[in-house]
């Protein structure tokens, strides 16, 4: 029989607490979310979204610890991270086509072929990137650079090795951001548009049971 001498370490995978799934009194939460970080920012407004896990909610709505600006994130954190309660139905009323603001051009230094834009709420599809200065060479997304968001929700621009910006020392970046401060109480309350048949805000509560049963 073999004996071990000295200090040994045993590592075990962190166990995950299974969420408590309810079939009655399910939360329906109305508010704002950082949908610029969502998988599809333009399909996450005034539509009931059901989530059974933190990952699922973040994928569909994005996430930020700035709970004052993004009120749905407080419920995402409390329900899935603190108390493991699922499912939760979310309705985001922040509309990226309506609640937005234009950001001034900013010069961002490049380090190791990457530049991080320290601006909140950027909609990735609105970004315009030029090499070095505002009058410099315009770069093409997915050809000269690719984008992603870091853990702080800031846009990271990565230059490609064969792109036109590969030797850039800085980038001039313009963009549009979502603006949660533009959301009003009227947006949350919502209503019914008789001409289009569209429902918004809390009026959508009528769709919850027919949609999710």
Residues covered by each model-derived region:
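Surface-exposed assembly/interface segments
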Residues: 1-213
């Amino acid at each position: 029989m073999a004996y071990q001498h000295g200090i040994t370490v045993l590592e075990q995978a962190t166990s995950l607490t299974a969420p408590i799934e309810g079939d009655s009194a399910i939360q329906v939460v109305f508010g704002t979310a950082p949908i610029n970080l969502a998988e599809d920012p333009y399909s996450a407004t005034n539509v009931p979204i059901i989530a059974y896990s933190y990952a699922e909610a973040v994928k569909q709505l994005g996430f930020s610890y700035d709970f004052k600006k993004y009120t749905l994130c407080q419920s995402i954190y409390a329900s899935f991270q603190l108390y493991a309660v699922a499912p939760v139905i979310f309705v985001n009323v922040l509309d990226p086509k309506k609640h937005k603001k234009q950001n001034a051009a900013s010069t961002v230094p490049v380090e190791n072929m990457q530049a991080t834009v320290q601006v909140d709420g950027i909609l990735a599809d609105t970004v315009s990137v030029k090499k070095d200065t505002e009058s410099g060479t315009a770069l093409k997304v997915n050809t000269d650079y690719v984008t992603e968001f870091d853990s702080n929700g800031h846009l990271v621009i990565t230059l490609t090795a064969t792109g036109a910006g590969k030797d850039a020392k800085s980038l001039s970046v313009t963009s549009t951001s979502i603006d949660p401060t533009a959301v009003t109480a009227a947006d949350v309350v919502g209503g019914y548009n008789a001409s289009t048949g569209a429902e918004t805000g809390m009026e959508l509560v009528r769709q919850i049971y027919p949609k999710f049963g």
